[in-house]
Amino acid sequence: MKKNRFTYGLALGALGVVFGDIGTSPLYALKVTLSGIPINQFNILGVLSLIFWSLIIVVSFKYLMIIFRADNNGEGGILALLALMKHKSTKYQPLFYIVAIFGAGLLLGDGMLTPAISVVSAVEGLGTLSDKLYPYVLPIASLILILLFSLQATGTGRIGYLFGPLILVWFITIAILGILQIAEHPVVLKAINPYYAIAFLVDEGLQGYLLLGGIFLVVTGGEALFADIGHFGKNPIRFSWFFAALPCLLLNYFGQGANLIVRPEAISNPFFMIAPSWFYLPLIIIATVATVIASQAVITATFSLTKQAVLLGLCPKIPIVQTSMLHSGQIYVPQINFILFIGTMAFCLAFKTSDNLAHAYGIAVNLEMLLVDAMVAYAAISIWRWSIFNVMFLFGLFLLIDLAFLGANTHKFITGGWVPIVLAFFIAFIMYSWRYGLEYLRDNFYMNKEDISKILKQLQYKSLNQLPGVSAIFITDVYDKSGGSFLHFLKLSRSVPENVLIVNYIVDNIPYVHYSQRYEIVCLDEKVCKLVIHYGFMETINIPRSLEKACNKNILPFKFNVDTATFMVEIPNIMASKEKRSLSFYWQEKLFAFLMRNYSANLNIEFYKLPYNRTIAIGTYCIL
């Protein structure tokens, strides 16, 4: 009984986070799809049939039944998939990196468009009250978005528990509105028959095919189901989809279609015009709340994706702020929030209406779905051990469908869809350059590493100036496992603290690391030890807290107080070589050197959660 209550609770929570994006698509999807073609029963049934089978095949079958199998120890998303691939393949790792970082860039671009189109489409409902209110749509939507991004720093912990019930109210509302229309014109239920979808595509030809770009809007947000596995689990998400989101969405789409059959003029805003006039204002309020929640879910997912990228070494250690002491998943990334805000506002001000935004929306998500399909297909062969025939048949079907959508979406590239794609390339270049630079640094430190034991003997450890009562913790970065900061300190000061701990952290290719696998320790001397701390890519790196737990568990051979110990971090000064090898490498080196110089000691201190008043930065120099 308790297990069922827990599942229902997670399912309700999933409604508010996972289905906000796909759940608000009825605001604009049918309007965009049917605009430009005759509003008659044949066309309406054809479009509704395409919507029905798109939701069944792409979301219900592909994502919930197949893609869900490719989780990484309970975590989903394209970067979690990358970490899983690193376990299983070395041959194709460079390709996986390129695919994953480009996919991550596409999701960031989507994070700008989704809040814009969702909020604007909801506020456009004011036009149903009076034409005089249309000029106020953009200012009101902009104000809502400004408030939304401004409040990110405070976190959503206090109101987050309301998201599920509020989205449930949204789904119930749109379902009832749809049922009322279907009851009057049940002929729309014929659209469940795939014949109408096929007949529509055959009859309309090229124009019908291009309308698939509008149909694709009903499945945007489906990628969020896979990305949010770790937050809620597979079964609660499936339960929420099949018993709440899917039936409510279909009822509303079919209700809009039923209304359009008898009132073709309702195409100006088919979502709001299925409601009675007295319900317009309450519906606008409910829709606006739902779109804000959907936007919040996208923003939070982008923050989570950024955290994964930082921990996997795909981007610099930008500041990540924990907004909740109880829930590690509630984070705020100031720089990403600012980028999303600027991008979202730029889209709103440039495109002005939901129709215009829809002509730029979808192509980035479409490409990301294709990349996930390809990676999961490889996982099916290498991890699940499916036969080549089964993989080619099933994923060939998925790729065929996604490529068909992509072909229909290509015209969106010139109407604004190029923006998230160009942004994705830019982000991918930054990530690839960062990864390339870290690998170079790792190789450089490895080739020039020094044996600490030999150095201690050469410096006559016993004759060095002793610092009694002083405990020093030297933190080395992922590219330097030899303890370079400690060696620099010894050579410069010719003094040694009473207790020395050289700490290196490793982010494993799993979301969470069990306590029994958290620590590795090697002692070089009775007072000098090297400690490796393992983290998962979904965890928060907190060196002082991890050391405190290690002390409490008597893992270290000596006692020291973390609250009084001195921390030392290594800050490399990277310079790009003046030797020109190739233009791409040259610019990668320049970019990496710039990023390293600008992620200063302060960012390292924040990233490791070190106390500012007890941390010393030790500089090093390296030429790429």
From Swiss-Prot:
<dbReference type="InterPro" id="IPR003855">
    <property type="entry name" value="K+_transporter"/>
</dbReference>
<keyword id="KW-0769">Symport</keyword>
<feature type="transmembrane region" description="Helical">
    <location>
        <begin position="10"/>
        <end position="30"/>
    </location>
</feature>
<keyword id="KW-0633">Potassium transport</keyword>
<keyword id="KW-0472">Membrane</keyword>
<keyword id="KW-0812">Transmembrane</keyword>
<dbReference type="InterPro" id="IPR053951">
    <property type="entry name" value="K_trans_N"/>
</dbReference>
<feature type="transmembrane region" description="Helical">
    <location>
        <begin position="363"/>
        <end position="383"/>
    </location>
</feature>
<dbReference type="Pfam" id="PF02705">
    <property type="entry name" value="K_trans"/>
</dbReference>
<dbReference type="GO" id="GO:0005886">
    <property type="term" value="C:plasma membrane"/>
</dbReference>
<feature type="transmembrane region" description="Helical">
    <location>
        <begin position="210"/>
        <end position="230"/>
    </location>
</feature>
<dbReference type="GO" id="GO:0015079">
    <property type="term" value="F:potassium ion transmembrane transporter activity"/>
</dbReference>
<dbReference type="Pfam" id="PF22776">
    <property type="entry name" value="K_trans_C"/>
</dbReference>
<feature type="transmembrane region" description="Helical">
    <location>
        <begin position="133"/>
        <end position="153"/>
    </location>
</feature>
<keyword id="KW-1003">Cell membrane</keyword>
<keyword id="KW-0997">Cell inner membrane</keyword>
<dbReference type="InterPro" id="IPR053952">
    <property type="entry name" value="K_trans_C"/>
</dbReference>
<dbReference type="GO" id="GO:0015293">
    <property type="term" value="F:symporter activity"/>
</dbReference>
<keyword id="KW-0813">Transport</keyword>
<feature type="transmembrane region" description="Helical">
    <location>
        <begin position="159"/>
        <end position="179"/>
    </location>
</feature>
<protein>
    <recommendedName>
        <fullName>Probable potassium transport system protein Kup 1</fullName>
    </recommendedName>
</protein>
<comment type="similarity">
    <text>Belongs to the HAK/KUP transporter (TC 2.A.72) family.</text>
</comment>
<feature type="transmembrane region" description="Helical">
    <location>
        <begin position="242"/>
        <end position="262"/>
    </location>
</feature>
<keyword id="KW-0406">Ion transport</keyword>
<feature type="transmembrane region" description="Helical">
    <location>
        <begin position="413"/>
        <end position="433"/>
    </location>
</feature>
<feature type="transmembrane region" description="Helical">
    <location>
        <begin position="48"/>
        <end position="68"/>
    </location>
</feature>
<feature type="transmembrane region" description="Helical">
    <location>
        <begin position="388"/>
        <end position="408"/>
    </location>
</feature>
<keyword id="KW-0630">Potassium</keyword>
<feature type="transmembrane region" description="Helical">
    <location>
        <begin position="270"/>
        <end position="290"/>
    </location>
</feature>
<feature type="transmembrane region" description="Helical">
    <location>
        <begin position="331"/>
        <end position="351"/>
    </location>
</feature>
<keyword id="KW-1133">Transmembrane helix</keyword>
<dbReference type="InterPro" id="IPR023051">
    <property type="entry name" value="Kup"/>
</dbReference>
<comment type="function">
    <text>Transport of potassium into the cell. Likely operates as a K(+):H(+) symporter.</text>
</comment>
<feature type="transmembrane region" description="Helical">
    <location>
        <begin position="94"/>
        <end position="114"/>
    </location>
</feature>
